Amino acid sequence: QFLKSWITVVTNQSKKDKRKRLKKNIYDTIEKIVNVLQPILVQKKVQVELIKDEQNAERRIFESDFESIFYNLIINSIEAFSKSSTKNRKIRIELKTNENLVVNYLDNGDGLDNKFKNPYEIFTLGSTSKYDQFGNVIGTGLGMYIIASTVREYNGDYKLTQIQNGFGLEIRIPL
């Protein structure tokens, strides 16, 4: 089940229609990626609470861009939980729409690694906190960089809302 979910995520990223900018309801795209990741979330004992207002967040997008944002956020949270003692593992994704799509993402893990003196370093290409038991780098340093680059590509912005006792990120993208 875990492998099937992983393969679905990877193959969905390369489908032809996802490489064309189409008018999409971004809420649906986010909900879809959460559902695809559900087997991994269940295996890792992580609950995702997806809260949406009654609006439609429609915009011409490359659907794979938004899948990538949420895939990276969720996988980072799962990996952070695996290194923490958090028992009741939760991710909360709150979606609101006004003239912007506003995403408030929050997990209840340990927060950012202390290695980051400036927390915004996490958005730098090559910046990682993933190491094996021998201290060798195993992270690519691409995930948060991809998120930041994609948000900027859509003329949006982002800010860290929590870096200790959990990780929080607010994303705003004009519609």
Language-model features, listed with the residues they occupy:
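Acidic ATP/Mg2+-coordinating residue in the GHKL
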Residues: 107
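Conserved glycine-/histidine-rich ATP-lid loop and adjacent helix of the Bergerat-fold HATPase_c
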Residues: 146-155
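Conserved catalytic submotifs in the C-terminal HATPase_c
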Residues: 47-58
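Glycine-rich ATP-binding loops of the HATPase_c
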Residues: 155-162
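Short conserved segment of the HATPase_c
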Residues: 112-126
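Conserved DHp (HisKA) dimerization/phosphotransfer helix of two-component histidine kinases, i.e.
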Residues: 1-46
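Glycine-rich phosphate-binding loop
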Residues: 135-146
